[in-house]
Amino acid sequence: MAQALPTKALINGSWVDGSGGTFPVHSPQSGALIADVALCDAGDVARAVEAARAAQPGWAATPLIERVKIMRQIHALFAARAEEVAQVLIIEIGKTVAEAREEVHEYAAPSWQKAGEEVLRHRGLSFPSTQEQTNNKRLVLTHRPLGVVGVITPYNFPTDIASIALAHIIAAGNTAVWKPSEFSPICCNMVAEICTEAGLPPGVLNVVHGMGEVGAAIVDHDDVDGLFFTGSTATGKRIAAKAALRPHLLELGGDGPVIVLADADIDAAVEGAMNACFYYAGQVCTSGERLLVHADIHDEFVSKLKARASQLRIGDPGLDDTEMGPLRNSATLGRVVEHVEEARAQGAEITQYGPQEGLFYPATILTGVTPEMTIAREETFGPVAPIIKISSIPEAIAIANSSKLGLIASLWTRDLATAWRVGEALQHGTVNINETSNYWDQLAPFGGTGNSGVGRELSQWFLERFTEQKLLVFDLGDTEVRYNRRAEGGW
């Protein structure tokens, strides 16, 4: 590495030790210690919130174009250090070279520039009053930042999800207290380093590290005005309950139905399923968690998927030709093993490709899966492809909608009318037609229904969530005779 790995907390512009000591971060592929990272406590969170509160008025008063210039500078510095950040992603969370570079180059770094561009377009409205029969009133709708926003992000896209959230939150004039996942603190600190180097004032971005208690301290703090969280549905529900009247945006679990109808391009659908199920070893909220394949093409699809999975190169994520690396932690591994073995016990046929060693879990295809199995009802978050045979479109829709989750779905068909009707019928925030479930666009709204979250993120939808609308009413005070509502019976 060109520089020593950053391991401290960032509070009010200074890199500081955590009051709780340190905690270790280990490589998922080798188990080797990468670094000991600052362990924060509720006191550190309080100091971070205090710093964010003190910095927020000045940051909000900073001319918009000056804030945007800093966003652009963050992007430029991030792009310059992109390969360095990508290499840490490989070591810290086990992404392959291609996956790490894609996260940093295609998503994380550009997010800062895109947020700066978007905030320039976040305009208000001016309109006349409709409540009086004079021309005295002018109404102006503006946006003001919420204030201090708590940001809690996961390990699977640590620089991407955080950059998208923080860039929009900060560009809008808010300040932030950020708790990255304890499984990805180092690459997140690199993002914070870039922000400070680019000229972000002290206190605008604060970073605290630790376990769930640190996140809870952010959520519980009375001086935190809004909350952003990406992670599990269970944790999201607890955050929503504590958020109460505070604005919050939650992106939670997914049920990932991939529906392959009888008229689908089978080869394309197989490639889509490979990406949906095995990209970053399935540790993606938009992963294909269940494949609903029509009986007419089921056998051909399964045969081709198995042939393709058998070619998957699994191993050291630091090698350029590796296509799938390890799971990030033992909890994820335990859930994957539990779901697969329960399905096996209930009659599913299991085919696996690759070794199960340490946190490496083989690419796994399950046939004979039924909708009642846990692996078909819950988010597994691993490299699994559970296949359910369907006989009709209504059956596919019913199974896809049977989950309480509804983040994203993938539908494969050649018929436009079918795509339109099924797309409308699926109760998911996004339906990708003839595209992997892992596709999303930074300028389109992203979010789910049901237990998959609250609100929509990306682009203008982020700015709407983390600003408040404010109405200014002007009486121009001219000499026109005012309309007398009482005299006319209006009141």
Regions found by a protein language model. Give the residues of each.
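Long amphipathic alpha-helix in the N-terminal Rossmann-like dinucleotide-binding domain
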Residues: G43, E50, V68, R72-E83, ...
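Short, well-ordered beta-strand elements within core beta-sheets of diverse protein domains
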Residues: L33-C40, A55-A61, G150-V151, V258-L261, ...
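ALDH superfamily catalytic-core signature
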Residues: A234-T370, I433, V481-R482, E488-G490
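Hydrophobic face of amphipathic alpha-helices that form TPR/SEL1-like repeat modules
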Residues: M1-Q29, F466
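Conserved C-terminal structural/oligomerization subdomain of aldehyde/semialdehyde dehydrogenase
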Residues: S30-A35, V224, I259, R313, ...
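A short hydrophobic/small-residue beta-strand
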Residues: T175-V177, I350, T430
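Residue-level signal for inorganic ion chemistry
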Residues: G31, R67, L89, G173, ...
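Rossmann-like NAD(P) dinucleotide-binding subdomain of oxidoreductase/dehydrogenase enzymes
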Residues: F127-A268, I390
